[in-house]
Amino acid sequence: MGKQNSKLKPEVLEDLKQNTEFTDAEIQEWYKGFLKDCPSGHLSVEEFKKIYGNFFPYGDASKFAEHVFRTFDANGDGTIDFREFLCALSVTSRGKLEQKLKWAFSMYDLDGNGYISRQEMLEIVTAIYKMVGSVMKMPEDESTPEKRTDKIFRQMDRNKDGKLSLEEFIEGAKSDPSIVRLLQCDPQSH
């Protein structure tokens, strides 16, 4: 029984090849690993937080992981299946900049209304600061989540309406690579 489970059905494999940037072999490899970590075939938010936390040993990644989980959980059923996992992984790891930015926008847009409010940005940025802990040295104008949020809004909120549209978000990020760094909070880019 366990044997047949470790192979994806041909139609699922074909669907994933069409909708991700992964090869047959990579998809099969990811599937094996996914089943090893999630024998049920579904990942709960608690399991996801545990796995995600392993990547950030010096901080608390649980809040940020919840936001990532919500964005991965495309159908909103409270679990991540292999298809949702691989599609999100494809965008975040191999997607073009615009795809990554759309994905990030959907994570920051907590209420799904098509805009990122200052409060939504602050919530995500605060979660990022908790996650990276004391590992990253921030410039003075980014030393707190509030300061970083203000800086992002100053640079992105073109029409000064106190919220970011998808267009403002994408244009702002494309015109200023430092914003992408601000959004990602990637320790490697410092």
From Swiss-Prot:
Gene Ontology BP term (one): positive regulation of circadian sleep/wake cycle, sleep
Annotated residues for binding of Ca(2+) 1: D73, N75, D77, T79, E84
Entry annotated with the keyword Transcription regulation: no
Covalently attached lipid (N-myristoyl glycine), positions: G2
Ranges for domain EF-hand: 40-58, 60-95, 96-131, 144-179
Residues noted as binding Ca(2+) 2 in the record, renumbered to the chain: D109, D111, N113, Y115, E120
Record: residues binding Ca(2+) 3: D157, N159, D161, K163, E168
CDD domains, alphabetized: EFh
Effect of a null allele: Viable. Adults exhibit reduced night-time sleep but daytime sleep appears normal. RNAi-mediated knockdown in the whole organism or simultaneously knockdown in the C01 and A05 neurons, results in a similar phenotype to the genetic knockout.
Cystine residue pairs: none
Keywords linked to the UniProt accession: Calcium, Lipoprotein, Metal-binding, Myristate, Repeat
GO MF entries: calcium ion binding
Tissue: Expressed in neuronal tissues. High level expression seen in the cortical regions of the central brain and lower levels in the lamina, the first optic lobe of the brain. It is also found in the thoracic ganglia.
Family: Belongs to the recoverin family.
Stored PANTHER family: CALCIUM BINDING PROTEINS, NEUROCALCIN HOMOLOG
Function of the molecule: Calcium-binding protein that is essential for promoting night-time sleep and inhibiting nocturnal hyperactivity. During the night-time it promotes sleep by limiting synaptic output from arousal- and wake-promoting neurons within the C01- and A05- domains that include the mushroom body, and the antennal mechanosensory and motor center. Regulated by the circadian clock network and light-sensing circuits that include the CRY photoreceptor; it is likely that both of these internal and external cues are required to define the temporal window (the night-time) during which this protein functions.
Protein name, UniProt field: Neurocalcin homolog
Organism name: Drosophila melanogaster (Fruit fly)
